[in-house]
Amino acid sequence: MKQITFAPRHHQLTNINTWTPDSRWLVFDVRPSGASFTGKTIERVNVETGEVETIYTAPQGAHVGVVTVHPSEEKYVFIHGPRDPDESWQYDFHHRQGVMVQNGRASNLDALDITEPYTPGALRGGSHVHVFSPDGNKVSFTYNDHVLHERDPRLDLRNVGVAAPFGPIMPGGNHPREYAGSHWCVLVSCTTPTPAPGSDEINRAYEEGWVGNNRLAFIGDTLSLSGEKVPELFIVDLPADEQGWKRAGETPLAGTSTTMPSPPMGVEQRRLTFTHQRRYPGLVNVPRHWVRSNPQGSDIAFLMRDEAGVVQLWLMAAEGGEPRQLTHNATDIQSAFTWHPSGAAIGFVLESRIALCDSVTGTIVFLTDSDPAHQPSADAVVFSPNGKRIAWMAPAAGFRQLWMADTGL
């Protein structure tokens, strides 16, 4: 176990894709806590030398955070808050965007168009937690809608979207907050403010993960027959070509003044888990986690309680079937998780220690000892691309610092 950062400030890792492709640098932001969005820089640290470099500094009163890295290039994408924020336009779920940086040059990922007629391929609100597909060709994100938020915040439902490399998108610029973007952006999930109890309808789509390069899994909040929220696992197949991404279904890709943007034609989510009758229904929201497929794209991992109420890791075949309980721990898994690049193991926090779980047998190997002064954060446990290291956050002398251990794999 090795401490990587030492500066007297906080360091925040995203929950996946936090390493450069050469496995030498960890990227981070400098939010004072994961819940606030007041960091000014995106930075990286060399895990061998401790050298720190600034990748991007936010201009004009803006803030930045939640950075991830392209799988094969030194290309970074992160959340960017509004420049020159004022009383009418401040950072919020529906007021933020993706920005990509490569070789020191920054560009907008998503375009914004909030005036009618809305522009297909542009968003009408904020994108968040941008993650490259395994081949680096596309970027997934979660989304909130400014237009519907202005009409009624109850209509502004969290959804999942994808940025595909078929831009640029140039809105009309009829509002001073509108901007162009490099990628064609659409939603791929479908929500309703009033899901029918006991149905497959959802009012929130979130915490998505790539399944190969052409599918996304995500958590969708269903309602039980008694009206209780039950988070279930969903999957959606993505279009195969540019025409597919740009072909509208029965409702407009860009949405209307009263409806959310719609997925392209034929892009329809499918429910994979049916847990309403379990003793502890649904995927857990605590710890917050993102559903994650193995590198082979065959199994999707998620967290759910067992019959004793303990949070365990479960696997679901991407094609469907019954979920399989992988871990049988005595205590809750305490964090988000990632897969080893071989697919042979999954890393997370258990018993306040960094744990490796065999992805076939569920056997646990601990990489760290219990250390009350440096308890790992629940936010992120991330393998390096070469599989030899694993990184996390833990406090040291009052600040959240970055730590690393060898995996032995």
Where are these regions (language model features)?
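Sequence signature of WD/YWTD-type beta-propeller architectures
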Residues: 1-409
